[in-house]
Amino acid sequence: MAILDTKSSRWIPHNLLFLLLLLLLQSVPYGFGQTQTTPPGTTKTKPNDPVVVVITVLFLVIFFMVFGSIFCRRSNAQFSRSSIFRSTDADAESQVVRIRRLTARGLDAEAIETFPTFLYSEVKAVRIGKGGVECAVCLCEFEDDETLRLMPPCCHVFHADCVDVWLSEHSTCPLCRADLVLNQQGDDDDSTESYSGTDPGTISSSTDPERGMVLESSDAHLLDAVTWSNSNITPRSKSTGLSSWQITGILFPRSHSTGHSLIQPAGNLDRFTLRLPDDVRRQLMKTSRTMGHVALLPQARSSRSGYRSGSVGSERSAFPYGRKSNNNNRRLHSLSFSFSFRSGSVRSTFSGDAPKNLPTSIEAGERSFERLRPDERV
């Protein structure tokens, strides 16, 4: 019995161990295959989940942005290369012309020389207006022995040395930005008339025989008569004394590309403007184009040239006109003028006979202009 007891006692632990091993082997697949279930009322969250999501989204956005920019740049480069290769000869020529226009915007020397060039002493006596005339580039008043260059479209005048530097780089007036590139016309008269139509300050002289006439001689085209008529003058305002175009300039100032005005448009603009009669300016244009150097105007003594109305004063002096040519010397003509204040015209005659309508005294012809004479009263 003792032996059986001892054997049975040894058998029991071995059996227990074997049974436990079987139970473990049976429970292992079931434990790994099951999922942990949470109660429906509770949610399991981790504190680091939002930060991870935000960082991931940022990285994705940055990646797509960099990739998109690189792709767009590569595609644009390929498209530009293909368009250049597909361009025709006409397109290439147009691109070359456009590049040349952008690089060379100034006027050439021949175009600059077509602008009238003269001495200030030659036009000082016949210009319209009072006060000195200044150069807008160097802001110096003109002297009698200085060479000036006139811009025909706007009648602004500058020193030839000052404005030539500007014109070599630009094709506009340095003061008002007027375009100086005009189509060359065959007839000089037509070209000068196209210029004169843009200037509001010049006094036009009519070609009507009743108001004046331009005489031609076999030796030269001389300026025989200058018409200053009150009917051709820009109307003035009775209250302010300013002309209509000056009032318009005050109310509506010129706007420039840089957003500022170069000068004040009211009275300061007259300092840089040389206003001449149409006949004188036409003669300047002809002389500058034919002779190709400094134009020489006939010396004329001005009588009371400071008045804007352009009325001729009491001096009835002869106007000697003459110009030297390369071939021969021109004759000097002396003209005597008779004035008819009833018709407001100037008539020229080569005879010594006095006209019938000549006023008997100086005061007879100046009575209507007594208000313009500040110091003298009749």
Swiss-Prot record:
* Organism of provenance: Arabidopsis thaliana
Q: What are the inducing conditions? A: Up-regulated by chitin elicitors.
| GO annotation, cellular component aspect | membrane
Residue ranges, compositional bias (Low complexity): 301-317
One GO term in the molecular function aspect is: ubiquitin-protein transferase activity
Q: Which PROSITE patterns match?
A: ZF_RING_2
Family affiliation: Belongs to the RING-type zinc finger family. ATL subfamily.
SMART domains in UniProt: RING
Gene symbol here is: ATL9
Q: Which UniProt keywords apply?
A: Membrane, Metal-binding, Plant defense, Signal, Transferase, Transmembrane, Transmembrane helix, Ubl conjugation pathway, Zinc, Zinc-finger
Signal sequence coordinates? 1-33
Its protein name is E3 ubiquitin-protein ligase ATL9
Top EC class for this record: transferase
Sum up the protein's function in the record's words: E3 ubiquitin-protein ligase able to catalyze polyubiquitination with ubiquitin-conjugating enzyme E2 UBC8 in vitro. May be involved in the early steps of the plant defense signaling pathway.
